[in-house]
């Protein structure tokens, strides 16, 4: 699910943090990709009759088709993808997963009804909602990646958190996912729409965390607190707290501790906290996720030559793909994986870490920016109140 309305807030408050460009702009870069999110997007690309792509035996092949051709497109454009699969979900996420399961059950019932009486749009809508990435989908995609020579890692828990660790360590340029909570896990750069189909004509969004924090006038802890308030996978949202209110609460109070205290002391009880709302546990999951360290041998990956005959056996013999297309794709893969060894110029220069003095100056700058925003909001309130108190018709 990610973080509700976070992209919209960044777009409005920190527009300089977002760059949009073509896939070819990522040439020569290694990217850690949230595999489960990608597979889900391949599976929901259903036809208007509500059916996924299938072979003659009636087996779903949408996930394999998407994984093969979208990965091929990335490699064609000089990108070296590293896929990261989800492990076991954190216990705190069980409530959200239960809700998703319930929604999928309801969608399945809705789909059956739509097939009887609904329009093509209804069928497509409900079909998307019933989609679930299974262990079999993951296992088949892992088998395919191995045959393609593309590395993958299975994270201990959340794939986005593992992608973020690899990006922080400089093992990859960025983490790629549609889930905005990748930024909460401290990924310096998030790429969105990287595994979308070419037909969708969606530009690649490149979001820089440092510029997000600068634009919002926040430190990372405040940013994570804002994301928890907006609504994340770990907790129920607070009723009546939307994006505008969440942003104002963080700017006024500075932390979730103070926000919770103010809500509990409010005699009017304008906002009522959910009965079980362990926000500190949620914050800990963002700051200390269960991940493999970047120097773990499992994270020491290589891009290998594809196994052409293995690809033909799996995709053509077992899954009914076109042999000509698979062989052509395998040849492109081998050729372009070699050519993507060419490094970008920026790869020769390591970023110099900030000194304590620079960090302190940056913190002061954020605090000053936050104070300016508070003063501006206060003045706007005064101006509104003054305008209301004026008699009608007064100049």
From Swiss-Prot:
Binds 2 magnesium ions per subunit. They probably participate in the reaction catalyzed by the enzyme. May bind an additional third magnesium ion after substrate binding. GO terms for cellular component: mitochondrion; nucleolus; nucleoplasm. It is found in: Nucleus, Nucleolus; Nucleus, Nucleoplasm; Mitochondrion. The keyword Hydrolase applies. Residues 344-395 are annotated as: Disordered. The keyword DNA-binding does not apply. Mg(2+) 1 binds at residues 34, 86, 158, 160. One of its GO terms (biological process) is DNA replication, removal of RNA primer. Residues 341-349 are annotated as: Interaction with PCNA. Residues 1-104 are annotated as: N-domain. It comes from the Eukaryota. DNA binds at residues 47, 70, 158, 231, 233. Interacts with PCNA. Three molecules of FEN1 bind to one PCNA trimer with each molecule binding to one PCNA monomer. PCNA stimulates the nuclease activity without altering cleavage specificity. Belongs to the XPG/RAD2 endonuclease family. FEN1 subfamily. PANTHER family: FLAP ENDONUCLEASE 1, FLAP ENDONUCLEASE FAMILY MEMBER. Structure-specific nuclease with 5'-flap endonuclease and 5'-3' exonuclease activities involved in DNA replication and repair. During DNA replication, cleaves the 5'-overhanging flap structure that is generated by displacement synthesis when DNA polymerase encounters the 5'-end of a downstream Okazaki fragment. It enters the flap from the 5'-end and then tracks to cleave the flap base, leaving a nick for ligation. Also involved in the long patch base excision repair (LP-BER) pathway, by cleaving within the apurinic/apyrimidinic (AP) site-terminated flap. This is Flap endonuclease 1. It comes from Fusarium vanettenii (strain ATCC MYA-4622 / CBS 123669 / FGSC 9596 / NRRL 45880 / 77-13-4) (Fusarium solani subsp. pisi). The gene is FEN1.
């Amino acid at each position: 699910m990610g973080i509700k309305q976070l992209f919209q807030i960044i777009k409005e408050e920190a527009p300089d943090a977002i760059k949009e460009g073509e896939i070819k702009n990522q040439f020569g870069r290694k990217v850690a990709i949230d595999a489960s999110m990608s597979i889900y997007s391949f599976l929901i690309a259903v036809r208007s009759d509500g059916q996924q792509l299938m072979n003659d035996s009636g087996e779903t092949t949408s996930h394999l088709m998407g994984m093969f051709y979208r990965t091929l497109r990335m490699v064609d454009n000089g990108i070296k993808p590293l896929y990261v699969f989800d492990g076991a979900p954190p216990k705190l996420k069980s409530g959200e997963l239960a809700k998703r399961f319930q929604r999928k059950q309801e969608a399945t019932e809705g789909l059956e009804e739509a097939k009887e009486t609904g329009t093509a749009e209804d069928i497509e809508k409900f079909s998307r909602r019933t989609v679930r990435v299974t262990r079999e989908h993951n296992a088949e995609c892992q088998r395919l990646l191995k045959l393609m020579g593309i590395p993958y890692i299975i994270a201990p828990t959340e794939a986005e958190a593992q992608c973020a660790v690899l990006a922080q360590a400089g093992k990859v340029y960025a983490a790629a996912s549609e889930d905005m909570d990748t930024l909460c896990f401290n990924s310096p750069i998030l790429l969105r729409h990287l595994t979308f189909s070419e037909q969708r004509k969606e530009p690649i969004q490149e979001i820089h965390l440092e510029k997000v924090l600068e634009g919002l006038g926040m430190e990372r802890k405040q940013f994570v607190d804002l994301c928890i308030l907006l609504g994340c996978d770990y907790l129920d949202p607070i009723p009546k707290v939307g994006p505008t209110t969440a942003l104002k609460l963080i700017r006024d109070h500075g932390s979730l501790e103070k926000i919770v205290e103010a809500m509990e002391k409010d005699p009017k009880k304008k906002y009522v906290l959910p009965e079980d709302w362990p926000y500190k546990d949620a914050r800990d999951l963002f700051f200390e996720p269960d991940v493999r360290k970047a120097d773990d041998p499992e994270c020491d990956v290589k891009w290998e030559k594809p196994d052409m005959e293995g690809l033909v056996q799996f995709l053509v013999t077992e899954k009914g793909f076109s042999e000509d297309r698979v062989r052509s794709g395998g040849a492109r893969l081998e050729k372009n994986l070699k050519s993507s060894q060419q490094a970008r110029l920026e790869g020769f220069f390591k970023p110099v870490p900030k000194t304590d003095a620079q960090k302190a100056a940056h913190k002061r700058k954020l605090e000053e920016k936050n104070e300016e925003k508070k003063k501006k909001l206060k003045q706007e309130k005064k101006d509104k109140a003054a305008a209301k108190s004026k008699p009608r018709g007064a100049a």
